[in-house]
Protein backbone atom coordinates (compact mmCIF):
# COMPACT_ATOMS: atom_id res chain seq x y z
CA UNK A 1 0.00 0.00 0.00
CA UNK A 2 3.02 2.32 -0.18
CA UNK A 3 2.44 3.59 -3.69
CA UNK A 4 2.04 7.31 -4.26
CA UNK A 5 -0.29 8.75 -6.85
CA UNK A 6 -0.17 12.48 -7.47
CA UNK A 7 -3.48 14.26 -7.64
CA UNK A 8 -4.82 17.80 -7.57
CA UNK A 9 -7.65 19.30 -5.64
CA UNK A 10 -8.50 22.91 -6.39
CA UNK A 11 -5.28 24.84 -6.92
CA UNK A 12 -2.95 22.71 -4.78
CA UNK A 13 -1.10 19.43 -5.27
CA UNK A 14 -0.75 16.66 -2.72
CA UNK A 15 0.10 12.99 -2.54
CA UNK A 16 -2.19 10.14 -1.66
CA UNK A 17 -1.77 8.82 1.84
CA UNK A 18 -0.11 5.47 2.40
CA UNK A 19 -3.26 3.66 3.53
CA UNK A 20 -4.49 3.00 -0.02
CA UNK A 21 -3.95 3.61 -3.70
CA UNK A 22 -5.82 6.37 -5.51
CA UNK A 23 -7.23 6.03 -9.02
CA UNK A 24 -9.17 8.31 -11.32
CA UNK A 25 -11.97 7.73 -13.80
CA UNK A 26 -13.08 10.40 -16.29
CA UNK A 27 -15.47 10.59 -19.28
CA UNK A 28 -12.51 11.34 -21.56
CA UNK A 29 -10.24 8.71 -20.00
CA UNK A 30 -8.97 5.46 -21.46
CA UNK A 31 -8.88 2.04 -19.83
CA UNK A 32 -5.38 1.56 -21.23
CA UNK A 33 -4.20 4.43 -19.03
CA UNK A 34 -2.61 4.08 -15.62
CA UNK A 35 -5.63 5.49 -13.80
CA UNK A 36 -3.73 8.55 -12.58
CA UNK A 37 -5.08 12.08 -12.39
CA UNK A 38 -3.54 13.05 -15.72
CA UNK A 39 -4.20 9.67 -17.35
CA UNK A 40 -7.49 8.42 -15.90
CA UNK A 41 -9.41 5.27 -16.69
CA UNK A 42 -12.59 5.56 -18.73
CA UNK A 43 -14.77 3.11 -16.80
CA UNK A 44 -15.49 1.87 -13.32
CA UNK A 45 -15.28 -1.65 -14.72
CA UNK A 46 -11.57 -1.08 -15.24
CA UNK A 47 -11.19 0.40 -11.77
CA UNK A 48 -13.00 -2.61 -10.29
CA UNK A 49 -10.30 -4.88 -11.75
CA UNK A 50 -7.41 -3.13 -9.99
CA UNK A 51 -8.74 -1.88 -6.64
CA UNK A 52 -8.40 -3.56 -3.28
CA UNK A 53 -9.40 -2.73 0.28
CA UNK A 54 -8.48 0.82 1.28
CA UNK A 55 -8.27 2.16 -2.27
CA UNK A 56 -10.11 5.23 -3.53
CA UNK A 57 -11.49 5.84 -7.01
CA UNK A 58 -12.19 9.51 -7.73
CA UNK A 59 -14.92 9.85 -10.37
CA UNK A 60 -14.58 13.06 -12.35
CA UNK A 61 -17.65 15.04 -13.30
CA UNK A 62 -19.44 14.78 -16.62
CA UNK A 63 -21.67 12.34 -18.48
CA UNK A 64 -20.66 8.69 -18.77
CA UNK A 65 -22.46 7.18 -21.76
CA UNK A 66 -23.05 3.55 -20.83
CA UNK A 67 -23.30 1.60 -24.07
CA UNK A 68 -21.67 -1.77 -23.30
CA UNK A 69 -22.62 -4.50 -20.85
CA UNK A 70 -20.90 -7.28 -18.94
CA UNK A 71 -22.62 -10.52 -17.91
CA UNK A 72 -23.07 -11.21 -14.21
CA UNK A 73 -23.07 -14.99 -14.18
CA UNK A 74 -24.33 -15.51 -10.63
CA UNK A 75 -27.62 -13.66 -11.15
CA UNK A 76 -27.81 -14.24 -14.91
CA UNK A 77 -28.15 -10.54 -15.69
CA UNK A 78 -26.21 -7.88 -17.58
CA UNK A 79 -24.72 -4.68 -16.22
CA UNK A 80 -23.24 -1.49 -17.54
CA UNK A 81 -20.95 -1.40 -14.49
CA UNK A 82 -20.31 -4.49 -12.37
CA UNK A 83 -18.61 -3.92 -9.01
CA UNK A 84 -17.31 -7.16 -7.50
CA UNK A 85 -14.08 -6.15 -5.71
CA UNK A 86 -14.60 -5.97 -1.94
CA UNK A 87 -13.22 -4.10 1.00
CA UNK A 88 -12.26 -5.88 4.20
CA UNK A 89 -14.33 -4.13 6.88
CA UNK A 90 -16.37 -1.02 7.65
CA UNK A 91 -13.10 0.79 8.38
CA UNK A 92 -11.27 -0.56 5.34
CA UNK A 93 -13.60 -0.11 2.40
CA UNK A 94 -13.18 0.51 -1.30
CA UNK A 95 -14.31 4.05 -2.11
CA UNK A 96 -15.97 5.18 -5.34
CA UNK A 97 -16.40 8.90 -4.79
CA UNK A 98 -17.41 11.85 -6.91
CA UNK A 99 -14.48 14.22 -7.23
CA UNK A 100 -15.11 17.15 -4.84
CA UNK A 101 -17.14 19.88 -6.48
CA UNK A 102 -18.01 17.76 -9.54
CA UNK A 103 -21.06 15.69 -10.51
CA UNK A 104 -20.64 12.42 -12.41
CA UNK A 105 -23.73 11.24 -14.32
CA UNK A 106 -24.09 7.65 -15.49
CA UNK A 107 -26.51 7.79 -18.40
CA UNK A 108 -28.00 4.48 -19.54
CA UNK A 109 -29.96 5.77 -22.53
CA UNK A 110 -27.83 3.72 -24.93
CA UNK A 111 -27.37 0.69 -22.69
CA UNK A 112 -28.37 -2.58 -24.43
CA UNK A 113 -30.96 -4.27 -22.21
CA UNK A 114 -31.83 -7.92 -21.69
CA UNK A 115 -34.76 -9.25 -23.70
CA UNK A 116 -35.73 -12.23 -21.51
CA UNK A 117 -39.28 -12.15 -20.20
CA UNK A 118 -40.38 -14.55 -17.44
CA UNK A 119 -37.32 -16.82 -17.42
CA UNK A 120 -33.59 -16.57 -18.16
CA UNK A 121 -31.92 -19.21 -20.31
CA UNK A 122 -28.60 -18.56 -18.59
CA UNK A 123 -27.01 -16.66 -21.46
CA UNK A 124 -26.32 -12.94 -21.83
CA UNK A 125 -28.75 -12.84 -24.75
CA UNK A 126 -31.52 -14.49 -22.73
CA UNK A 127 -31.01 -12.57 -19.49
CA UNK A 128 -34.09 -11.05 -17.88
CA UNK A 129 -32.57 -7.95 -16.28
CA UNK A 130 -30.04 -5.21 -16.99
CA UNK A 131 -28.88 -2.44 -14.66
CA UNK A 132 -26.47 0.46 -15.21
CA UNK A 133 -24.74 -0.38 -11.92
CA UNK A 134 -24.73 -3.82 -10.29
CA UNK A 135 -23.04 -4.24 -6.90
CA UNK A 136 -22.04 -7.74 -5.82
CA UNK A 137 -19.45 -7.04 -3.15
CA UNK A 138 -18.77 -6.17 0.48
CA UNK A 139 -17.71 -2.96 2.20
CA UNK A 140 -17.98 -0.37 -0.53
CA UNK A 141 -18.70 3.35 -0.24
CA UNK A 142 -20.38 4.95 -3.27
CA UNK A 143 -20.96 8.68 -3.17
CA UNK A 144 -22.05 11.75 -5.07
CA UNK A 145 -23.27 10.72 -8.52
CA UNK A 146 -26.41 10.30 -10.63
CA UNK A 147 -27.80 7.27 -12.45
CA UNK A 148 -30.48 7.91 -15.05
CA UNK A 149 -32.46 6.80 -18.10
CA UNK A 150 -32.31 3.02 -17.75
CA UNK A 151 -34.35 1.44 -20.60
CA UNK A 152 -36.39 -1.78 -20.58
CA UNK A 153 -38.07 -4.32 -22.86
CA UNK A 154 -40.14 -6.79 -20.79
CA UNK A 155 -38.80 -6.42 -17.24
CA UNK A 156 -38.22 -3.36 -15.10
CA UNK A 157 -34.53 -2.53 -14.70
CA UNK A 158 -33.13 -0.90 -11.57
CA UNK A 159 -30.84 2.10 -11.65
CA UNK A 160 -28.64 0.47 -9.00
CA UNK A 161 -29.01 -3.25 -8.24
CA UNK A 162 -27.37 -4.73 -5.13
CA UNK A 163 -27.19 -8.51 -4.96
CA UNK A 164 -25.91 -10.81 -2.19
CA UNK A 165 -23.79 -7.98 -0.84
CA UNK A 166 -22.81 -6.74 2.60
CA UNK A 167 -22.42 -3.29 4.14
CA UNK A 168 -22.67 -1.16 1.02
CA UNK A 169 -22.71 2.55 1.91
CA UNK A 170 -24.57 4.65 -0.68
CA UNK A 171 -24.42 8.39 -0.09
CA UNK A 172 -25.81 11.37 -2.00
CA UNK A 173 -26.79 9.28 -5.02
CA UNK A 174 -29.67 10.35 -7.26
CA UNK A 175 -31.30 7.58 -9.31
CA UNK A 176 -34.03 8.87 -11.61
CA UNK A 177 -35.95 8.38 -14.84
CA UNK A 178 -35.24 4.66 -14.91
CA UNK A 179 -37.60 2.03 -16.31
CA UNK A 180 -37.68 0.30 -12.95
CA UNK A 181 -36.74 0.95 -9.31
CA UNK A 182 -34.22 3.63 -8.51
CA UNK A 183 -32.46 1.28 -6.07
CA UNK A 184 -33.03 -2.46 -5.50
CA UNK A 185 -31.31 -4.61 -2.85
CA UNK A 186 -31.68 -8.41 -2.98
CA UNK A 187 -29.58 -10.15 -0.34
CA UNK A 188 -31.23 -13.55 0.23
CA UNK A 189 -29.82 -15.82 2.93
CA UNK A 190 -26.19 -14.88 2.35
CA UNK A 191 -25.65 -13.23 5.73
CA UNK A 192 -25.40 -9.89 3.96
CA UNK A 193 -27.40 -6.70 4.01
CA UNK A 194 -26.52 -4.02 6.50
CA UNK A 195 -26.48 -1.35 3.82
CA UNK A 196 -26.79 2.36 4.53
CA UNK A 197 -28.64 4.66 2.14
CA UNK A 198 -27.71 8.16 3.32
CA UNK A 199 -29.19 11.26 1.67
CA UNK A 200 -30.15 9.45 -1.53
CA UNK A 201 -32.97 10.37 -3.93
CA UNK A 202 -35.11 8.17 -6.18
CA UNK A 203 -37.65 9.89 -8.40
CA UNK A 204 -39.50 9.83 -11.69
CA UNK A 205 -38.93 6.11 -12.21
CA UNK A 206 -41.53 4.35 -14.41
CA UNK A 207 -41.67 0.92 -16.11
CA UNK A 208 -44.29 1.29 -18.87
CA UNK A 209 -43.81 -2.06 -20.64
CA UNK A 210 -43.33 -4.37 -17.66
CA UNK A 211 -44.86 -7.78 -18.48
CA UNK A 212 -46.57 -7.68 -15.06
CA UNK A 213 -48.27 -4.38 -15.78
CA UNK A 214 -47.80 -0.76 -16.79
CA UNK A 215 -46.04 0.93 -13.84
CA UNK A 216 -46.15 -2.22 -11.70
CA UNK A 217 -42.58 -2.39 -10.34
CA UNK A 218 -40.85 0.99 -10.50
CA UNK A 219 -40.42 1.80 -6.81
CA UNK A 220 -38.08 4.46 -5.54
CA UNK A 221 -36.22 2.19 -3.10
CA UNK A 222 -36.67 -1.58 -2.82
CA UNK A 223 -35.21 -3.99 -0.27
CA UNK A 224 -36.33 -7.59 -0.75
CA UNK A 225 -35.75 -11.30 -0.07
CA UNK A 226 -33.30 -11.04 2.83
CA UNK A 227 -33.58 -13.76 5.49
CA UNK A 228 -30.57 -13.15 7.74
CA UNK A 229 -27.56 -10.88 8.13
CA UNK A 230 -27.58 -7.22 9.14
CA UNK A 231 -30.18 -4.46 9.15
CA UNK A 232 -30.34 -2.06 6.21
CA UNK A 233 -31.03 1.60 7.00
CA UNK A 234 -32.34 4.62 5.14
CA UNK A 235 -31.50 8.06 6.54
CA UNK A 236 -32.40 11.38 4.91
CA UNK A 237 -33.70 9.80 1.69
CA UNK A 238 -36.48 11.01 -0.62
CA UNK A 239 -38.73 9.17 -3.09
CA UNK A 240 -41.21 10.93 -5.34
CA UNK A 241 -43.17 10.47 -8.53
CA UNK A 242 -42.27 6.81 -8.88
CA UNK A 243 -44.92 4.80 -10.72
CA UNK A 244 -45.26 2.15 -8.00
CA UNK A 245 -44.26 2.82 -4.37
CA UNK A 246 -41.77 5.14 -2.73
CA UNK A 247 -40.18 2.54 -0.42
CA UNK A 248 -41.06 -1.15 -0.83
CA UNK A 249 -39.87 -4.01 1.39
CA UNK A 250 -42.20 -6.72 0.08
CA UNK A 251 -40.96 -10.22 0.99
CA UNK A 252 -38.19 -8.74 3.14
CA UNK A 253 -37.87 -11.20 6.03
CA UNK A 254 -35.34 -9.17 7.98
CA UNK A 255 -35.76 -5.75 9.65
CA UNK A 256 -35.27 -2.48 7.78
CA UNK A 257 -35.00 0.95 9.43
CA UNK A 258 -36.19 4.15 7.74
CA UNK A 259 -35.73 7.50 9.44
CA UNK A 260 -35.90 11.20 8.55
CA UNK A 261 -37.04 10.31 5.03
CA UNK A 262 -39.76 11.51 2.64
CA UNK A 263 -42.22 9.95 0.20
CA UNK A 264 -44.33 12.15 -2.08
CA UNK A 265 -46.57 11.62 -5.08
CA UNK A 266 -45.79 7.97 -5.66
CA UNK A 267 -48.24 6.37 -8.07
CA UNK A 268 -47.93 9.37 -10.40
CA UNK A 269 -45.75 9.62 -13.52
CA UNK A 270 -44.58 12.25 -16.00
CA UNK A 271 -43.75 14.78 -13.28
CA UNK A 272 -47.04 14.19 -11.51
CA UNK A 273 -49.31 14.78 -14.49
CA UNK A 274 -50.83 11.28 -14.84
CA UNK A 275 -51.20 7.85 -13.23
CA UNK A 276 -50.10 4.50 -14.69
CA UNK A 277 -52.78 1.79 -14.72
CA UNK A 278 -50.89 -0.69 -12.52
CA UNK A 279 -48.87 1.38 -10.06
CA UNK A 280 -49.72 0.96 -6.37
CA UNK A 281 -48.88 4.44 -5.14
CA UNK A 282 -47.96 3.89 -1.49
CA UNK A 283 -45.44 6.11 0.24
CA UNK A 284 -43.82 3.63 2.64
CA UNK A 285 -44.85 0.02 1.91
CA UNK A 286 -43.25 -1.84 4.81
CA UNK A 287 -44.21 -5.43 4.10
CA UNK A 288 -45.07 -8.08 3.71
CA UNK A 289 -43.16 -10.51 5.93
CA UNK A 290 -44.36 -14.13 6.08
CA UNK A 291 -42.11 -15.56 8.80
CA UNK A 292 -42.70 -13.01 11.58
CA UNK A 293 -39.12 -11.68 11.41
CA UNK A 294 -39.60 -8.56 9.34
CA UNK A 295 -40.47 -6.04 12.05
CA UNK A 296 -39.38 -2.75 10.55
CA UNK A 297 -38.88 0.66 12.17
CA UNK A 298 -40.15 3.85 10.56
CA UNK A 299 -39.57 7.09 12.45
CA UNK A 300 -39.58 10.84 11.76
CA UNK A 301 -40.74 10.25 8.18
CA UNK A 302 -43.19 12.24 6.06
CA UNK A 303 -45.57 10.91 3.40
CA UNK A 304 -47.76 13.23 1.38
CA UNK A 305 -49.75 13.33 -1.84
CA UNK A 306 -49.27 9.63 -2.57
CA UNK A 307 -51.98 8.02 -4.70
CA UNK A 308 -52.79 5.29 -2.16
CA UNK A 309 -51.62 5.06 1.46
CA UNK A 310 -48.95 7.11 3.19
CA UNK A 311 -47.71 4.37 5.55
CA UNK A 312 -48.74 0.81 4.65
CA UNK A 313 -48.04 -2.64 6.12
CA UNK A 314 -49.17 -4.69 3.08
CA UNK A 315 -50.70 -7.82 4.63
CA UNK A 316 -47.79 -8.76 6.83
CA UNK A 317 -47.71 -11.38 9.58
CA UNK A 318 -45.66 -9.23 11.96
CA UNK A 319 -46.24 -5.62 12.91
CA UNK A 320 -43.77 -2.80 12.48
CA UNK A 321 -42.89 0.18 14.66
CA UNK A 322 -44.19 3.55 13.42
CA UNK A 323 -42.93 6.47 15.52
CA UNK A 324 -43.36 10.24 15.04
CA UNK A 325 -44.37 10.21 11.39
CA UNK A 326 -46.53 12.69 9.49
CA UNK A 327 -49.06 11.64 6.84
CA UNK A 328 -50.64 14.45 4.83
CA UNK A 329 -53.24 14.32 2.07
CA UNK A 330 -52.64 10.77 0.90
CA UNK A 331 -55.31 9.41 -1.39
CA UNK A 332 -56.52 6.23 0.32
CA UNK A 333 -55.42 6.08 3.94
CA UNK A 334 -52.94 7.86 6.14
CA UNK A 335 -51.86 4.68 7.92
CA UNK A 336 -53.04 1.34 6.53
CA UNK A 337 -52.17 -1.73 8.60
CA UNK A 338 -53.76 -4.81 6.95
CA UNK A 339 -52.37 -8.11 8.24
CA UNK A 340 -52.77 -11.82 7.58
CA UNK A 341 -51.59 -15.33 8.54
CA UNK A 342 -49.65 -17.83 6.44
CA UNK A 343 -49.22 -21.57 6.86
CA UNK A 344 -45.84 -23.06 7.75
CA UNK A 345 -44.90 -23.21 4.09
CA UNK A 346 -45.06 -19.37 4.11
CA UNK A 347 -46.98 -19.52 0.84
CA UNK A 348 -50.57 -20.40 1.73
CA UNK A 349 -52.76 -17.83 3.44
CA UNK A 350 -54.75 -19.31 6.31
CA UNK A 351 -56.84 -16.18 6.71
CA UNK A 352 -57.16 -13.13 4.52
CA UNK A 353 -57.25 -10.43 7.19
CA UNK A 354 -56.59 -10.77 10.91
CA UNK A 355 -55.69 -8.39 13.72
CA UNK A 356 -52.11 -8.59 14.95
CA UNK A 357 -52.05 -8.80 18.72
CA UNK A 358 -49.59 -8.91 21.61
CA UNK A 359 -45.93 -9.16 20.54
CA UNK A 360 -46.93 -9.27 16.87
CA UNK A 361 -48.96 -6.07 16.99
CA UNK A 362 -48.00 -2.88 15.22
CA UNK A 363 -46.58 -0.13 17.41
CA UNK A 364 -47.94 3.26 16.36
CA UNK A 365 -47.02 6.23 18.56
CA UNK A 366 -46.87 10.01 18.17
CA UNK A 367 -48.03 9.99 14.54
CA UNK A 368 -49.99 12.67 12.70
CA UNK A 369 -52.72 11.83 10.18
CA UNK A 370 -53.85 15.07 8.57
CA UNK A 371 -56.35 16.14 7.35
CA UNK A 372 -57.97 12.68 7.13
CA UNK A 373 -58.31 12.05 10.85
CA UNK A 374 -59.94 8.70 11.56
CA UNK A 375 -62.04 7.63 8.60
CA UNK A 376 -58.96 6.76 6.56
CA UNK A 377 -56.59 5.47 9.20
CA UNK A 378 -57.33 1.85 8.22
CA UNK A 379 -55.90 0.21 11.32
CA UNK A 380 -55.63 -3.58 11.14
CA UNK A 381 -58.69 -4.80 9.33
CA UNK A 382 -60.38 -4.93 6.00
CA UNK A 383 -63.81 -6.20 5.00
CA UNK A 384 -63.34 -8.75 2.21
CA UNK A 385 -67.04 -9.08 1.36
CA UNK A 386 -70.44 -8.81 3.01
CA UNK A 387 -70.18 -12.50 4.01
CA UNK A 388 -66.79 -12.07 5.73
CA UNK A 389 -68.18 -10.37 8.82
CA UNK A 390 -65.67 -12.16 11.07
CA UNK A 391 -62.91 -10.06 9.53
CA UNK A 392 -64.71 -6.80 10.18
CA UNK A 393 -63.01 -6.19 13.51
CA UNK A 394 -61.19 -3.12 14.76
CA UNK A 395 -57.87 -3.85 16.42
CA UNK A 396 -55.58 -1.58 18.46
CA UNK A 397 -54.47 1.47 16.51
CA UNK A 398 -51.60 2.64 18.65
CA UNK A 399 -51.22 5.27 21.32
CA UNK A 400 -50.80 9.04 21.41
CA UNK A 401 -51.59 9.52 17.73
CA UNK A 402 -53.89 12.22 16.38
CA UNK A 403 -56.69 9.69 15.94
CA UNK A 404 -56.37 8.43 19.51
CA UNK A 405 -56.91 11.98 20.74
CA UNK A 406 -59.70 12.61 18.23
CA UNK A 407 -57.50 15.54 17.28
CA UNK A 408 -58.83 17.28 14.19
CA UNK A 409 -55.85 19.40 13.17
CA UNK A 410 -56.24 22.38 10.87
CA UNK A 411 -53.98 24.62 8.83
CA UNK A 412 -53.53 26.82 11.91
CA UNK A 413 -51.55 24.05 13.63
CA UNK A 414 -48.74 24.27 11.06
CA UNK A 415 -46.21 26.90 10.04
CA UNK A 416 -46.90 26.18 6.38
CA UNK A 417 -48.79 23.79 4.14
CA UNK A 418 -47.27 25.35 1.03
CA UNK A 419 -44.58 23.57 -0.97
CA UNK A 420 -43.89 23.26 -4.70
CA UNK A 421 -44.76 19.56 -4.43
CA UNK A 422 -48.33 20.58 -3.56
CA UNK A 423 -48.88 22.78 -6.60
CA UNK A 424 -46.27 22.18 -9.31
CA UNK A 425 -46.63 19.43 -11.92
CA UNK A 426 -44.95 18.94 -15.26
CA UNK A 427 -41.61 20.17 -13.90
CA UNK A 428 -38.57 18.59 -12.26
CA UNK A 429 -39.05 19.19 -8.53
CA UNK A 430 -35.39 18.47 -7.77
CA UNK A 431 -34.47 21.87 -9.21
CA UNK A 432 -37.09 23.92 -7.31
CA UNK A 433 -36.37 24.97 -3.69
CA UNK A 434 -38.64 23.06 -1.32
CA UNK A 435 -38.96 19.70 0.39
CA UNK A 436 -37.74 17.91 -2.73
CA UNK A 437 -35.47 20.64 -4.03
CA UNK A 438 -31.69 21.06 -3.88
CA UNK A 439 -30.07 19.59 -0.79
CA UNK A 440 -27.71 21.36 1.58
CA UNK A 441 -23.99 21.32 0.78
CA UNK A 442 -23.44 18.39 3.14
CA UNK A 443 -26.19 16.41 1.41
CA UNK A 444 -28.71 16.79 4.22
CA UNK A 445 -32.37 17.57 3.66
CA UNK A 446 -33.37 21.16 2.94
CA UNK A 447 -34.74 22.96 6.00
CA UNK A 448 -38.17 24.32 5.01
CA UNK A 449 -41.34 25.15 6.94
CA UNK A 450 -43.68 22.66 5.26
CA UNK A 451 -45.66 20.63 7.85
CA UNK A 452 -43.68 21.98 10.79
CA UNK A 453 -45.73 22.69 13.91
CA UNK A 454 -46.57 26.29 14.71
CA UNK A 455 -46.29 27.79 18.18
CA UNK A 456 -49.49 26.90 19.98
CA UNK A 457 -50.21 23.88 17.78
CA UNK A 458 -52.40 21.29 19.46
CA UNK A 459 -49.91 18.60 18.42
CA UNK A 460 -47.17 20.06 20.66
CA UNK A 461 -46.35 18.10 23.84
CA UNK A 462 -49.04 15.51 23.07
CA UNK A 463 -46.71 12.57 22.52
CA UNK A 464 -45.13 9.81 24.56
CA UNK A 465 -41.43 9.62 25.37
CA UNK A 466 -40.09 6.98 22.96
CA UNK A 467 -36.42 7.79 23.37
CA UNK A 468 -36.16 10.48 20.69
CA UNK A 469 -34.99 14.03 21.54
CA UNK A 470 -37.72 16.53 22.40
CA UNK A 471 -37.84 20.16 23.48
CA UNK A 472 -40.91 20.65 25.68
CA UNK A 473 -42.45 18.87 28.63
CA UNK A 474 -43.34 15.96 26.36
CA UNK A 475 -42.61 14.95 22.76
CA UNK A 476 -44.69 16.44 19.97
CA UNK A 477 -46.68 14.51 17.42
CA UNK A 478 -45.36 14.11 13.91
CA UNK A 479 -41.98 14.17 12.22
CA UNK A 480 -40.86 17.66 13.27
CA UNK A 481 -40.34 18.56 16.93
CA UNK A 482 -41.23 22.19 17.68
CA UNK A 483 -38.34 24.21 19.10
CA UNK A 484 -35.63 21.93 17.75
CA UNK A 485 -33.68 22.11 14.50
CA UNK A 486 -34.76 19.73 11.78
CA UNK A 487 -33.32 16.26 12.29
CA UNK A 488 -29.91 16.04 10.69
CA UNK A 489 -29.50 13.47 7.96
CA UNK A 490 -25.72 13.51 8.23
CA UNK A 491 -24.87 10.25 9.95
CA UNK A 492 -22.08 10.44 12.49
CA UNK A 493 -22.01 6.67 12.77
CA UNK A 494 -23.94 3.66 11.59
CA UNK A 495 -23.44 0.18 12.96
CA UNK A 496 -25.01 -1.38 9.89
CA UNK A 497 -22.81 0.26 7.31
CA UNK A 498 -19.70 1.33 9.09
CA UNK A 499 -18.59 4.52 10.67
CA UNK A 500 -18.56 7.85 8.94
CA UNK A 501 -15.25 9.47 9.70
CA UNK A 502 -15.32 11.88 12.64
CA UNK A 503 -11.87 13.24 11.87
CA UNK A 504 -9.42 13.36 9.02
CA UNK A 505 -7.34 10.24 8.59
CA UNK A 506 -3.83 10.66 9.85
CA UNK A 507 -0.94 10.32 7.44
CA UNK A 508 1.00 7.12 7.93
CA UNK A 509 4.24 7.59 9.86
CA UNK A 510 5.93 5.34 7.33
CA UNK A 511 5.01 7.50 4.36
CA UNK A 512 7.71 9.49 2.64
CA UNK A 513 7.71 13.23 2.34
CA UNK A 514 5.57 14.43 -0.53
CA UNK A 515 7.49 15.32 -3.64
CA UNK A 516 5.24 18.27 -4.37
CA UNK A 517 5.32 21.60 -2.56
CA UNK A 518 1.98 22.37 -0.94
CA UNK A 519 1.14 26.04 -0.70
CA UNK A 520 0.12 27.38 2.66
CA UNK A 521 -3.66 27.66 2.69
CA UNK A 522 -4.80 31.21 2.29
CA UNK A 523 -7.42 32.98 4.37
CA UNK A 524 -10.58 33.70 2.42
CA UNK A 525 -11.50 37.38 2.52
CA UNK A 526 -15.09 38.56 2.44
CA UNK A 527 -16.40 35.03 2.75
CA UNK A 528 -20.10 34.44 3.36
CA UNK A 529 -21.45 31.17 4.69
CA UNK A 530 -19.61 28.20 6.16
CA UNK A 531 -17.10 25.95 4.40
CA UNK A 532 -17.52 22.19 4.12
CA UNK A 533 -14.76 19.99 5.50
CA UNK A 534 -13.88 16.53 4.15
CA UNK A 535 -11.23 13.96 4.89
CA UNK A 536 -8.93 12.69 2.15
CA UNK A 537 -11.44 10.00 1.26
CA UNK A 538 -14.00 12.66 0.43
CA UNK A 539 -16.11 11.94 3.51
CA UNK A 540 -17.97 14.87 5.00
CA UNK A 541 -16.79 15.84 8.47
CA UNK A 542 -18.62 19.07 9.24
CA UNK A 543 -18.38 22.80 8.61
CA UNK A 544 -16.16 25.73 9.52
CA UNK A 545 -17.97 28.98 10.33
CA UNK A 546 -17.38 31.87 7.95
CA UNK A 547 -15.51 33.94 10.52
CA UNK A 548 -12.85 31.24 10.99
CA UNK A 549 -12.06 31.23 7.27
CA UNK A 550 -10.73 34.78 7.43
CA UNK A 551 -7.88 33.73 9.73
CA UNK A 552 -5.66 30.70 10.21
CA UNK A 553 -7.66 27.84 8.70
CA UNK A 554 -5.33 25.16 10.07
CA UNK A 555 -5.80 26.53 13.58
CA UNK A 556 -9.57 26.58 13.08
CA UNK A 557 -9.53 22.95 11.95
CA UNK A 558 -7.47 21.92 14.96
CA UNK A 559 -9.90 23.66 17.28
CA UNK A 560 -12.89 22.08 15.55
CA UNK A 561 -11.71 18.49 15.10
CA UNK A 562 -8.69 18.24 17.44
CA UNK A 563 -6.95 15.60 15.32
CA UNK A 564 -3.82 16.00 13.23
CA UNK A 565 -4.10 15.05 9.59
CA UNK A 566 -4.90 16.34 6.12
CA UNK A 567 -8.24 18.01 5.49
CA UNK A 568 -10.04 19.28 2.40
CA UNK A 569 -11.82 22.60 2.93
CA UNK A 570 -14.34 23.56 0.27
CA UNK A 571 -16.03 26.93 -0.01
CA UNK A 572 -17.99 27.58 -3.18
CA UNK A 573 -15.92 26.28 -6.09
CA UNK A 574 -12.61 26.51 -4.24
CA UNK A 575 -11.09 23.50 -2.46
CA UNK A 576 -7.95 23.84 -0.35
CA UNK A 577 -5.88 21.11 1.24
CA UNK A 578 -4.90 21.95 4.81
CA UNK A 579 -2.43 20.03 6.96
CA UNK A 580 -3.04 20.11 10.71
CA UNK A 581 -0.04 19.10 12.84
Model-assigned labels for residue ranges:
Residues 67, 76-79, 260, 294-447:
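Predominantly extracellular beta-rich ligand-binding scaffolds that present long acidic/polar faces
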Residues 424, 432-487, 491:
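Surface beta-loop-beta hairpin patches that serve as ligand-binding interfaces in beta-rich domains
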Residues 536-575:
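Short, surface-exposed loop/turn motifs with a glycine/proline- and acidic-biased composition
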Residues 45, 49-53, 66-95, 105-143, ...:
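Extracellular beta-strand-rich solenoid/capping regions of secreted or surface-exposed proteins
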Residues 60, 93, 97-103, 138-149, ...:
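Right-handed parallel beta-helix
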Residues 68-69, 108-111, 116-118, 130-131, ...:
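Short glycine/acidic-rich loop motifs that flank beta-strands on beta-rich extracellular proteins
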Residues 488, 494, 517, 533, ...:
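Terminal processing/anchoring signals of secreted or surface-associated proteins
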Residues 27-66, 80-84, 457, 476-479, ...:
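Acidic Gly/Asp/Thr-rich repetitive segments characteristic of extracellular carbohydrate-active
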Amino acid sequence: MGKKFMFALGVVLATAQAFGAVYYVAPDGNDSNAGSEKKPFATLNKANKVVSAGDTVWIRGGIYDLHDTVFYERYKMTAGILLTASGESDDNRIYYLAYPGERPIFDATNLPVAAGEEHSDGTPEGAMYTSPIVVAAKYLHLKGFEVRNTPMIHNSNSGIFIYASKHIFLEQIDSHHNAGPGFFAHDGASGGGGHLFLNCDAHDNYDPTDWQGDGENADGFGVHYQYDGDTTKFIGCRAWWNSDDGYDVLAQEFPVVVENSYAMGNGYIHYGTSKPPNGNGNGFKMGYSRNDKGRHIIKNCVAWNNVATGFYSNYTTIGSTWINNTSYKNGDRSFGMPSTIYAEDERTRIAEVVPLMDDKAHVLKNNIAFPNKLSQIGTCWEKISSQDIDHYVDCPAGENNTWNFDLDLTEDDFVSLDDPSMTVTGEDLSTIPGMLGPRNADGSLPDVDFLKLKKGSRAIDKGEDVGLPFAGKAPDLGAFEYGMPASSSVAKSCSSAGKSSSSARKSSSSSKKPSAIVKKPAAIAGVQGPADVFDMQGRYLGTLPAETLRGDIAEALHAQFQVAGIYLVRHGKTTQQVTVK
